[in-house]
Each structure stands twice: as structure tokens, then as C-alpha cells.
Amino acid sequence: TKFASNLHEPLGMFWKDGSLFATQRPEHTRLTDKDGDGRADSFDTICSKWGISGDYHEYAFGSDPDKNGDVWMVLCLTGSFHAHAPWRGWAAKITPEGKFIPVASGIRSPGGIGANDRGDFFYTDNQGVWNGSSSLKWLRAGSFQGNPTGNKSAALANFPTPPEPTSGSRTLAERLKFPEYVPPALILPHGKVGNSPSGVACDMSKGKFGPWESHMLIGEQTASQVQRVNLEVVNGLYQGAVFHFLGGFEAGLIPVRMDQEDGTLFIGGSNRGWGSRGSKNFTFERVRFKGKV
């Protein structure tokens, strides 16, 4: 049943207090059915503090609310080399009242965002400038994620401007120069574990999805797969390992969500604008644990 239409590429949705909340390209929106006919008739802008320039690449990915009710979001750069609008290449929180709070800089091309069982937020960043291979990154508050393109918004955030990383340098050397730099929790070998990671989910179903409690699940658009990630904290930073997990989906995977009540994994797919192993234009698929590994 259609609830709403004409949204601008929403890449993050959740229900709360009888309304549907959507992170769209230009704004975070509350959609409400006030007359009870099953269709949204009230569209309220909660926050629209970031900028867009019209470039196709300027996606906005939003999370479910955290324990404080804040929505975390990551904002793509303008293409691969520019930040033509405010807050491009940044992560931020949106409070229930609509306040925009910058959280981290240094982002390139996110494909999804989600929290682990500790409530820490992670996003997938795609291979390209300053990202030798795609990765899963921890959004520690106040951190720099490695790509300096969006540094021009640091003054707006009252953040220290990170120095330009040295091409060909090493993570340890760059962290000594700028301790706010947080290296990837996990690097995804390009071509071996896909080329374009997307949605992020965490298995907190207490065994309903199998023996992978607290593991992260990330989508892969090019290869039409789901990868499984096991993380640990060492010396205050996340690190971990990635495993091929599920394949054979019918389009490129974008959102990945788990129903923690019954352990069903829901996956949305599309090959619009980016080729994928799955050949369908749009899909909605689900995965349930059969009881065997």
C-alpha cells in the first residue's frame, strides 16, 4: 500500500510515534497520516541544515534513532573531488527537535550507516580518493575519517581543521600528526569482498538469525551480496574480520535491515546508476535462518 510519494531519494526510514521519518537528499522529514486514510498528508521538515548543489552524488544516509532519539547521518561529497555545498563529507546528528550537530569529518562516499550492539555507529565508505579500498568505519564523535575534501566546513563546526594526509603514508604516522584520525575498523579488499559496500545492520536477534549475535551485516551493491563482520575493540579502536556470507540477490544491495523480534533480514536492491551482478532494476528480498549453518 502506497503511504507517500515524490520523496527525494530517501536513504533511511523508521516509524516512531505513529509517523514515518525519512532522511531524504535535502532534508530529514516526518510523514504523518492525520486523517486516517492510510496515506501521508502531513510532511514536516525536521532538519535541512546541510546543502545540495544538484550533483547526483550528494546522497544523505540516515540511521534509526539512537538511545537519545538522535538520528545519525552521513553526507556524500560532491562527486569524488569536491564539496560544493556545506557539510559535504561530514557526519552529523539530528536531534528530535531538529538541531543539526556535526559529529565527524573526512567522509568520502558512504553507502549506509548503522549501529552495533554497543550503540556505536558505523558507516561504509566506498573506494576512491583517499580510500584505497572500501571500508567499514567507526563514527567516533569528533573524529576525522581520512578524506580532507570536506574540511572547508570545519570552521562551521568549530572543529580543528585536519591537516592534509600525506599520500603514501601509513596510518600510524598520520595518527601521530592528528590523533583525531580514526582508521577504518575494517578494510574490504577491493574485488575480493566486493566493490561498493552499502547498508549496515547488526544481528541482535538473540539467536533467531543463527549463531551470529552481535555480528555486523553489510550489503554489497556491485556483487549483490551480504558480508558478515565480527568486530572487537583493541586499545580504544575497533578492528575485525569480514566473511563472505550471503549471495545470489537479484539486484545491487542498498538498505539492509534486521527485524530483531523474529530475526528476518530485509534487503532492498537496485541497479540504477551502478551495475550489479543481480540484473533486476528494483527488488525487496528477505532472508530467514533455517536452523542449519
Which residue ranges define each predicted feature?
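Beta-propeller domains with acidic blade repeats across secreted/periplasmic ectodomains
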Residues: 1-293
